[in-house]
Amino acid sequence: MNAPDKTGTRRRAIPAAVDLDALIRAEHRDPFSILGPHGDGGSGQYVRAYLPAALSVRLLARDDGRELGEMEMSEVPGFFVGHLEHPQPYLLKINWAGGEQITEDPYSFGPLLGEMDLYLFAEGNHRDLSSCLGAQVTSVDGVDGVRFAVWAPNARRVSVVGSFNSWDGRRHPMRMRHPTGVWEIFVPRLQPGEVYKYEILGAHGILPLKSDPMALSTTLPPDTASKIAAPLQFEWNDQEWLQSRAGRHEVTAPLSIYELHAGSWQMEQVEDNQWRQYNWRELADRLIPYVKELGFTHIELMPIMEHPFGGSWGYQLLAQFAPTARYGSPEDFAFFVDACHRAEIGVILDWVPAHFPTDTHGLAQFDGTCLYEYADPKEGFHQDWNTLIYNLGRTEVHGFMLASALHWLKHYHIDGLRVDAVASMLYRDYSRNAGEWVTNRFGGRENLEAIDFLRHLNDVVALEAPGTMVIAEESTAWPGVSEPTQQGGLGFNYKWNMGWMHDSLQYMEEDPINRGHHHGKLSFSLVYAWSERFVLPISHDEVVHGKHSLIDKMPGDRWQKFANLRAYLSFMWTHPGKKLLFMGCEFGQWREWNHDRELDWYLMQYAEHVGVKNLVGDLNRLYREEKALHERDADPAGFQWLVGDDSANSVFAYLRWSNDGEPLLVVANMTPVPRLDYRLGAPMRGAWTELLNSDAETYAGSNFGNGGEVMTEAEPAHGMEDSLVLNLPPLAVLILKPKKD
């Protein structure tokens, strides 16, 4: 060991027995206090390393590789001690049974994370946490490697493990940074692509190996390891889109969203009954032209964050910062987003800050305690989904979820987040009986911590990612969901109009002969249509679990089902509010959605299905081109009833107005009986052009209508001096516009 011959020197070379015993048992709370370089009491240094299964270790000079001496193995197998005459950068030359390894000593590096990073994390306000915690490919003191950092404040010991250390938790125990509870270590010479997990010693022993909550990449399920990922290596080409995005997201702009599940939109058949999911690059080639043809302004992806169980559709996810490996690499996903933007299609992600699954490799009992979740099951266990609820009242968890949102918006150029299950976050008694929930500090049912989080989220997103959107799936009458936080609201850009969805679908499911008794189901939404900024959603939730597909909800024979569907979609596209339609509904898929199968594309050989698809394309085109259909969605003056009470005929008629005073007339006949000579007031005299007839032949309808154009008559109706006399096709919607000279 070449140690100086001084009294006590040998004693200082070997740690105290209690420390050595704790290290061997992998229970030492501060391995840096005994491993690595330490002063010898004079001008030199002892170097200690614990390398179980190593045969021998030599010290080399880092600058030129010359040999500095051999490290002696102590009485404890694997514990080596060497001596340096004076402090200097060194390398460890380790002889293993399988070969030789030369590396820097992980325990020769000082504290890694800056005090400001730790402070902001503890405060719950670190805006770029995905570049701080987790596995960061970096350089420390000129040495390339990976810095690991994980929050586990109640752990007795945390080690990073992987194939690089034979998954041996004794090899790389980490340093705890008090008082934040973050553990860190720099492992030299590690490369992107290596897999890893954390081995955590809790109060009651070693826990199941844990995936990294901050992982930027993962292995393909059912494997559960995290994967080291370099900073996103992608050259973006969407600057024009980003510059124009804020204008595209104004409440006066058209917003038409195509919701899809990336893995089951289309698949490739590789063998009989064997299907392969497309990766992001392949999906871009197929999906983007299709969405462009149909005229949607945005797509909305069901959660693409890594999730262990495919049957959860992504809503029970564990990697809030990593795209699932099912469809390729993080760079592949960036390519997909960039390609969408270059085609002028926005990308919205479903995002889940409400709950997470109980998988043992995940967040549950992460350090042996309820760290991310509430400790009391009355607060922390979601009975509907058998999941755990994020404790957003804890600043670190609050900041963790806030950083996840910003990660997708900033690193992946995502245009908006649709926040899942907001209602379950707002109420402590959500889906709970009396005695099964805990009140807030004021004795109420509101979840004050979640409310604070949602308001903070929306304020921070507006500041850090201007021009993006945050949309709430919120199913209750909570007031001010889309009101600014400064006015007491939650601050979302939009809220899903679940009331419209339920009422309108219930109306459409009625046999037309009975619809007159349920007339208000279709008109009631106009009572509150401007109480929030709404998105009208026909989402995946409406075409699963025995609810039937959208077309299969419709009553009648085959012809009537298609006519009802076309009328419903036309009503939806002319109703105030932005639009969202789930994949398959745009061509009338009969089968409920199944995440294990692609859509039934073979249906496109039938005229009725092609007709529905053509209608959706034309509705989107009109919706974008006609300002009256989108400009005043949030302004009640942009809508005017003409006929809302004709329950005997099940006819609805209304005007949509643009900011410059141009109207569109919408007339819906929700029975299979043609209505001849139906008189409606007209705000402008002259010819009115039939922009759309959902019964047109091009949509596989009966082609009953008005010949494309109608002249007003000098006959008062509905408070107007002139009127139109129209033939209303069966189960159909007409859209008319005054003809300009």
UniProtKB/Swiss-Prot annotation:
UniProt keyword annotations, A-Z: Carbohydrate metabolism, Glycogen biosynthesis, Glycogen metabolism, Glycosyltransferase, Transferase
Broadest EC class assigned to this enzyme: transferase
An annotated GO BP: glycogen biosynthetic process
Active site residues of this protein: D420 (nucleophile), E473 (proton donor)
Catalytic activity of the protein: Transfers a segment of a (1->4)-alpha-D-glucan chain to a primary hydroxy group in a similar glucan chain
Domain of life: Bacteria
Entry GO terms, CC: cytosol
SUPFAM superfamilies, per the entry: (Trans)glycosidases, E set domains, Glycosyl hydrolase domain
Function of the protein: Catalyzes the formation of the alpha-1,6-glucosidic linkages in glycogen by scission of a 1,4-alpha-linked oligosaccharide from growing alpha-1,4-glucan chains and the subsequent attachment of the oligosaccharide to the alpha-1,6 position.
Protein name, as recorded: 1,4-alpha-glucan branching enzyme GlgB
